[in-house]
Amino acid sequence: MKLLVKAPAKINLSLDVLGKRQDGYHEVKMIMTTIDLADRLELTELTEDRIEIVSHNRYVPDDQRNLAYQAAKLLKEKYQVKQGVSIAIEKTIPVAAGLAGGSSDAAATLRGLNKIWNLGLTMDELAELGAEIGSDVSFCVYGGTAIATGRGEKIEHIKTPPSCWVILAKPHIGVSTADVYGNLKLNRVTHPDVDQMAEAINRGDYQGICNAVGNVLEDVTFAMHPEVARIKTRMKRFGADAVLMSGSGPTVFGLVHHDSRMHRIYNGLKGFCEQVYAVRLLGERETLE
């Protein structure tokens, strides 16, 4: 059996870190939403008992470092699946960009193999398994828009934000999430109001959403990589309604309501940044269909 699965990227509209936990993870409170930028995975069932990762992107590992590989391995071991799988990954989401590309690939693998191997797992069960792989995988199983707490694995779904353009700009660097969290000093940062963002989304208040964006990790990444701060400044200057770094970076996104302004910002960033995208907010939840 062969199955094609989409793995959409996410952005953080609001991201706060509340403290460090005894297990070494950080306690977070954040709002994530999916966007119309996606990897495509082709899952092909194999008769041999092996997991194969195929990708033409040299930054995508083809072994157990790959989160899609880990997802397949987890299902095989937990449910004693004897068949193997070939996972062909067509990367569109930039790697190590703060957009959950690897986590979304893992989530898509969980959803797809649940169907191919007739495991009959619910979305909640898949999300619980996803938490064993990575903090963002649970959200990526569902997609849509949600408040994530704990280390990111506790998901509360909220309404979809009003539709708008999202301009993404990624410089030619990768950022280590562990390094960013390691340099975070919680008593020296501005904490965003995540509840205010949730209320604005539930009201369908686009201006309120723009006013409430915030990411406690921004200043840390900006200090480590000043070019990320320069992208934010440039995007603001070209007229984005709101600008924020996603996750631990280095990708910066801008929310834009009007087509003409979107084109101006997009063109103003091309050449200044290695990768620039203009996509739409998705906000739709995944299904098991």
From Swiss-Prot:
SUPFAM superfamilies: GHMP Kinase, C-terminal domain (SSF55060), Ribosomal protein S5 domain 2-like (SSF54211). It comes from the Bacteria. GO terms for molecular function: 4-(cytidine 5'-diphospho)-2-C-methyl-D-erythritol kinase activity; ATP binding. ATP binds at P94, V95, A96, A97, G98, L99, A100, G101, G102, S103, S104. HAMAP family: IspE (MF_00061). Belongs to the GHMP kinase family. IspE subfamily. This is 4-diphosphocytidyl-2-C-methyl-D-erythritol kinase.
